[in-house]
């Protein structure tokens, strides 16, 4: 295609079609194609200005806390459990680990990158080539309809009005203040336990809205939650011969930021350090619990002191989320992501991921369940939702994280929690952890967790990610609500939405646009807003059937006119109708689809960026994926994407690049890859491939630990209110005696051995007295072993069950800075003598800090000198 604006006739036709009237000296192309946008200068691009803005808006800035410098230690010394990994081929642990146990301390800093910027305005350029291709195709249609013109107009408007990028410091700060307002403003956050809820009553609501099953499979059960991370990797066999590695660690995005104290590095680059710090934290916690930590007095002080040493576990990096923003709000709206410290992320993921990844339970496969967790709109998923909407019974609701969907009086409501994460309290997360432990980590009534993990989940993890802190520039500031992006974000948000629906049920399900429904905000301290409402929803959906236009899924031809859609905003999806399949099928909401088409994200996978030819491969993936998620329904967008993808394919083939290898893992290159997870589909869009993608299949069978009440959430809400529901006073069916059944296997074996020994040596009055006393001694020894094992199992289980009911949250108090100039003082990089032996160092090495000047260095603390002397004595004793 030559440039569409080269021809005078084309320019005239474009002017007439789009109402463009260039004056003297103006060009049609300049008026239609937006120029490169240069963002304004960021007004808060310095720590002092950012601190002042936050303080003026009542935002809490914390006294800067320092970190010990990282020092190198041999991996085998720190992680002896994983020494075998250093002997196998392939990706293994590094020979050394860098741990925060140095003899100098520093104030950390983190300066996120914001693009586009005034200096780099074209960091993420719009897809002008796609726009020109669509204009060219538009000109080829003799009598183009308004629908086709709207496609070009919508793409042009998105290029003109929006930009893809990561915002500004001003946008981040404004978002922080808005989150604070949600948490503390007109409907301040409230502790659900003070509203009459209990952990168990909330769990029984979640039994309906988020049913879960145990981790692992029937033929491969998961290991109990009783180990440190390094022992979740189990070697079977011999590293010199045949071996297998059983991996019980959670799936983690290793390309994401590692957080403190490894700013600028990824989790994949610091995986050994992540495991080592997690190991030692849990071991120290376990040791303190055995000493009675968590109770009043000195033992509790020891626990708080340990948590103070590990303060960085609760301090996330505040980075800007790259999105497609309105240019007009570039300085006021930037979504923040709270990047959890890697060990924090790992430990919480060890609780949540094994359960949630193995619980494909939702509205599609469980009667009465309103959950959209793991819902996929393809393969008949969206058609099932439309059938649910069309059914006459109402009111009714669906829920996914901070999204609520209600059908009431034949009106569809899409409701979002307002800045959802800001509504969360530590007690909400405690309830979520209680649910995952008692419902997920349960084997026929036996808890699969110990006291250490229960204490971490219930009493420590909530303080690490809710109302904790974050780092931006050299400022350490408070986080209001939960940090967005932590390993429990989804569950916490889903719990908040569940409470909203519970109150709605207790109010006899009023209309969402009523004042009565709005009053739920004040009652719960949870803010929400109606994002979209569609009246006569059933009538509008029925109209899609006769109005469906010929296309890929209605006749197997390329579309000439778009089929109408109903924009449900169902996790971003709309509905249209396929005559060939006889069902409703998903297309991405039109605004979102054309916005995605306007601004490519580019190759986000850093490991792929360096590959030669990856940019052309990305174009193939991008254009075909746009068609798969709904572009196929819009004639100009579909054809333009098809042409541009073909051009990129030809380029790769001409250069001799192995196209199949590039596209084998195409979902890694697509922002929509998650929607196609688990689908074996070809990337080239054809009527056949689209039909295969949308043809209904039976839903996955559910995996639940306990039956779901088919009466739904309404029945459970009412039963809980009247006290008629099962086991309200109990602990979710986790019974101490049932636990003992599984925990006492060793005791049973010991008793069996004693009985076997007794039978093998009958009581013979003529037997030698020495032999008889030996037999008696063996019997007593076996019985003693059985007794001790039984007692230990009962005590450990009792401690675990007691911990999972605890409402305490343990966190040190970190002082606030009143003067913003003090908070933003450029102390970053300033090195100070270490004030203490950190918990990591003491646990790993049994020693405090070491100084280049020797043991008697004047800058050393008394504790450091004491620990160094102890280490020296230990060293001498080994020689």
Curated annotation (Swiss-Prot):
May exist in multiple phosphorylated forms. The keyword Cell wall biogenesis/degradation does not apply. Its EC number is 2.7.7.48. Keywords: Covalent protein-RNA linkage, GTP-binding, Nucleotide-binding, Nucleotidyltransferase, Phosphoprotein, RNA-directed RNA polymerase, Transferase, Viral RNA replication, Virion. PROSITE patterns: RDRP_DSRNA_BIR (PS50524). Residues 398-598 form the RdRp catalytic domain. One of its GO terms (cellular component) is virion component. One of its GO terms (biological process) is viral genome replication. Residues 847-879 are annotated as: Disordered. GTP binds at residues 259-266. It is found in: Virion. Its main location: virion. GO terms for molecular function: GTP binding; RNA-directed RNA polymerase activity. It comes from the Viruses. It catalyses: RNA(n) + a ribonucleoside 5'-triphosphate = RNA(n+1) + diphosphate. Interacts with VP3 in the cytoplasm. RNA-dependent RNA polymerase which is found both free and covalently attached to the genomic RNA. May also contain guanylyl and methyl transferase activities. This is RNA-directed RNA polymerase.
